Amino acid sequence: MKRSLDYIKNIFVIVCISFFGSLHSETNTIVYVKKSEKTLTVTKAGKTILKIPISLGFEPEGPKKEEGDGKTPEGTYTIDYQIPEWDYYKALHISYPNKTQLEEAKKRNVKAGSGILIHGMKRHWNWFGHLHTYLNWTHGCMAVTNEEMDLLFEMVPVGSKIRIEP
């Protein structure tokens, strides 16, 4: 019985920390992506703290409509978790697709896509530095250098909003 109560208390504490932590970060840190400028800007309390060049999906114009279209989504999402180690160094996961996008894809009998990230470079590609931004090469993600990914990991807490604009 005591174990069950301890378990319930631990779950309650985790839920409270997650809820109140995301409320705090939502109002403080916002990531803005301007696809037309190929830039990612991080603001905290309304002040720009980082602006960096990015690569986008290989067909960047227009909103993402289905899996495999090479488009980077447009809209407002949440950074819902961090990936500390991955094929492309580190990554921040974006809450794409939302309910509306899932419904629209279902109507067209296609998959909306998933796995949209802000990520670094494969370790053996990192020497490219910002040269990677001359091409849009991802499948819909936003790519930055590994050094920039380290900064984003520090600056952008889980629960932060991300606004991706055309």
Question: Each PLM stretch: what is its role?
Answer:
Residues 2-12:
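Bacterial N-terminal signal peptides that target proteins for export
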Residues 26-29, 56-80, 99-104, 146-147:
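N-terminal post-signal-peptidase region of extra-cytosolic proteins
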Residues 83-166:
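Exported/periplasmic cell-wall-interacting domains
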Residues 37-39, 76, 115:
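Structural motif
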Residues 27, 48, 73, 86-88, ...:
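A short, polar/charged loop/turn motif at coil->beta-strand junctions and beta-hairpin connectors
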Residues 25-67, 166:
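Intrinsically disordered, low-complexity
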